[in-house]
Amino acid sequence: MQEALYRKYRPDSLKKLVGQSDAVTLIEKQIKNNNLSHAYLFSGPRGVGKTSLARIIATTLGCDPVFDITEIDAASHNKVDDIRELNDSINFIASSPGKKRVFILDEVHMLSNAASNAFLKTLEEPPEHVIFILATTEPERVLETIKSRTTHIAFKRIGNDEIISTLNEIGKNEKIKINDDVLSYIANQSDGSLRDAINLFEQTHNTFGNKATIDDLYSILGKVSIADLQQIIESINTQDTSKILHILSLIHISEPTRQVL
């Protein structure tokens, strides 16, 4: 089974992380000066590099991916017992003397209040060899007492130009050529999420090949084609109600879930 493009092109170094120059600059300086924080809170929209940066920090520190890096989905491990199990595990030493252990908690806002409170003591006084990286799309739901014990880095939505540039680079490597109008629409549709853009780019090519059009994208996204939309607008202008209903009926028959914007 072929590896998904967003996984294949997940950044594995600071210089490859797209659209987060402020975060990269801060982490680069802290690594260089050997003064990384014991706990971080990465907040921002999905698909903008939060988990990728957490993994990059761990690998840059030489952490063994099996023994020294622990990723926890707080959405499904959000109870007090889950945090107690985490607290018990942090005292295990790293795989090599002097190495760090990195714990990445994704969707940390999903922790229950009881679990969050159970985590506070550990977060405040972690073992010297442990770094916590908490990630969230909803920082306003994270307890203030947790926020105050972390270095908070806010991730930005990625700009369309950077998304298009990345898609072009992936296309070049994969021998995929999709026209610029389609790439621009993919970037707009992704709303600043590079992961979403790469997924839509891959889906578009897998479905329609290099000759994909904007209307093909509309089909994938469940939206009405430009041609149909123009006919609807013209019919509204001429107050041709029967034609409007006819067009909408045809759209519903062919694509029941398609949206008229």
Question: PLM features: residue spans?
Answer:
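P-loop/Walker A NTP-binding region and its immediately flanking N-terminal helices
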Residues: M1-H152, D161-E162, I170
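Extended, largely alpha-helical regulatory/partner-binding modules appended to the mid-to-C-terminal parts
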Residues: V48, A54, T59-T60, K99, ...
